[in-house]
Amino acid sequence: MAFRARVLTLYPEMFPGHLGFSLAGKAMERGQWSLDLVQIRDFATDRHRTVDDTPAGGGAGMVLKADVLARAIDSAGENDPRPRLLMSPRGRPLTQQRVRELAAGDGVVIVCGRFEGVDQRVIEARGLEEVSVGDYVLSGGEPAALIVLDAIIRILPGVMGNDLSGLHESFEGGLLEHPHYTRPQEWEGREIPSILTSGNHGAIEKWRHEEAVRLTRERRPDLFEKVESEKNG
């Protein structure tokens, strides 16, 4: 069964973006996943097609209206079982574990926020899961939605040519990925580590693991501490 993605946005022309190319694009052509785009503005009821209003209590910016967004969400039907994500800088950080969980399902509904934010009432009433792709603010949820979809699609069964290739990537197993090398053997005075051309697969795997541990300890001590606590736990 194809993975069904549904994206609610004020800028549907931003999709599929880069997902129309390479692995994701070919997977879409093969019918391994589909993308349904919903223009939120189509669910406004006034002649100006208004989707936002000033924040209650005052303040800068505009807020996406609960009634308009709710109608857009409900257009998929009452019994749509797919998780509903709201791209938001205040959301829980997206993790590889959550990506795997989403990829194991039938699909996902992603709401792309705009303006200052989304009326809290629709977040609660429609069970939106707020998700962040990093500690920074974007002009809208569309780039973040593309990131989420990219992470999901590439691990769908059969999308990558070698399903084992994803097992050694960063965050699989909790560690960052080890360094990579390819021919030529020597480049600008720098050699490929001899262990990688030794033919000793056990030693190669040991080296790769040690390098993954080293990089994780140096660059992401938060991840390293988590892995260590789980290992000792």
From Swiss-Prot:
Any single biological process term in GO: tRNA N1-guanine methylation
Record bears the keyword Transmembrane: no
Cystine crosslinks: none
Taxonomy, superkingdom: Bacteria
Single Gene Ontology MF annotation: tRNA (guanine(37)-N1)-methyltransferase activity
Main location: cytoplasm
Keyword Cytoplasm (UniProt): yes
Cellular location(s): Cytoplasm
Record keywords, A-Z: Cytoplasm, Methyltransferase, S-adenosyl-L-methionine, Transferase, tRNA processing
Catalysis performed (reactions): guanosine(37) in tRNA + S-adenosyl-L-methionine = N(1)-methylguanosine(37) in tRNA + S-adenosyl-L-homocysteine + H(+)
EC number: 2.1.1.228
Enzyme class: transferase
GO cellular component: cytosol
Listed InterPro entries: Alpha/beta_knot_MTases, tRNA_m1G_MeTrfase_C_sf, tRNA_m1G_MeTrfase_TrmD, tRNA_m1G_MTases_N, tRNA_MeTrfase_TRMD/TRM10
Residues that coordinate or bind S-adenosyl-L-methionine: G113, V133, G134, D135, Y136, V137, L138
NCBIfam families listed in its UniProt record: PRK00026.1, trmD
Stated family: Belongs to the RNA methyltransferase TrmD family.
Functional note: Specifically methylates guanosine-37 in various tRNAs.
HAMAP family: TrmD
Subunit composition and interactions: Homodimer.
Protein name according to UniProt: tRNA (guanine-N(1)-)-methyltransferase
Organism of origin: Rhizobium etli (strain ATCC 51251 / DSM 11541 / JCM 21823 / NBRC 15573 / CFN 42)
Lineage: Bacteria, Pseudomonadati, Pseudomonadota, Alphaproteobacteria, Hyphomicrobiales
